Amino acid sequence: MKSGFVSVVGRTNAGKSTMINSLLGENLCLVSHKENATRRKMNVVIMHKENQIVLVDTPGLHESNKSFNQLLIEAAKKSIDECDLILFVMSVFDKIDEYKKFLELKPKVEHLVVLNKVDLIEPEKLLAKLSEFNALEKVPNIIPYTSKNKFYKTKLLDEIIKYLPEHPYFFDPEYTTDKNTKDVIKELIIESIYQNLSDELPYCCEVLISKVIEKDNSLTIYADIVTDSENHKAMLIGRDANTIKRIGIVARKRISELFLLKTNLKLIVKVQKKWYDNENFLKKVGLKQ
């Protein structure tokens, strides 16, 4: 029996969360085409051949001078030092410089390079990409991957197990995440915000879950969407409340599908100026310890 923690790191939009969801077989981690959608570390529990893999989904590695983004970057870097193995995920279209930047972090544990989205590239171009890695002074263990083929899933999980220690399970095998119900619901609402709003507005929003009531095979959820200005509040609500309705419909569908319960979602938009610089608020929403 093996069990261990595996940090999943890489630049923003490398496909980390999509990869984790495909390995798990559920859409648990927040997925968006926008950068820095993942804000919080999430442990995802995967059972494979009587072994337990705890994948740690982290914020994307990127360069930024903004204090809030620095907070996300530090969370990702910290996870690198608190695991048994690192999966460095990069798109097959990324330059090898992305991997070199990762090496500059001087990881203390072994790592695998997961070359993601290989289904989108021609075979000869994939070979050319692999040859770039072979030219490095120390050639890493590279695992090609696509979420659209189960063969790649099994191959990656088999490879991960080789690096994990003999250890009892850290979590009940029935668990899929260590997050509580409120945390999972929060992520699904944030995902809907990213899907339904454009430009910079999603980055100005955070979600607080006030109450979750489970009764008679249904969920009733009271949640606040917190933004930083009255102007952004108006945009979130939209004309005739169409935008907030759309956010609610998408989030409610995802929550209902995940928990297999009829869901009633009540959203209220509130303003808290510069919430991203408020230490107490960041602790309250789980972005800072």
Q: What residue spans do the PLM features occupy?
A:
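Conserved glycine(s) of the Walker
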Residues: G15, Y152, T243
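Conserved C-terminal guanine-recognition region of P-loop GTPase G domains, centered on the G4
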Residues: V45-Q52, L71-I142, I213-S218
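Canonical P-loop GTPase G-domain recognition
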Residues: V109-E110, D119-D183
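Catalytic P-loop NTPase motifs of RecA-like helicase/translocase cores
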Residues: T38, H62-E63, I96, I121-E122, ...
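Conserved G1/Walker A P-loop phosphate-binding module
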Residues: M1-I80, D224-T227
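Signal for well-folded cores of large energy- and translation-related assemblies
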Residues: L24, L28, N43, M47, ...
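Residue-level signature of catalytic and energy-coupling elements of molecular machines
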Residues: V9, M19, M42, D57, ...
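P-loop NTP-binding site
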Residues: T181-Q289
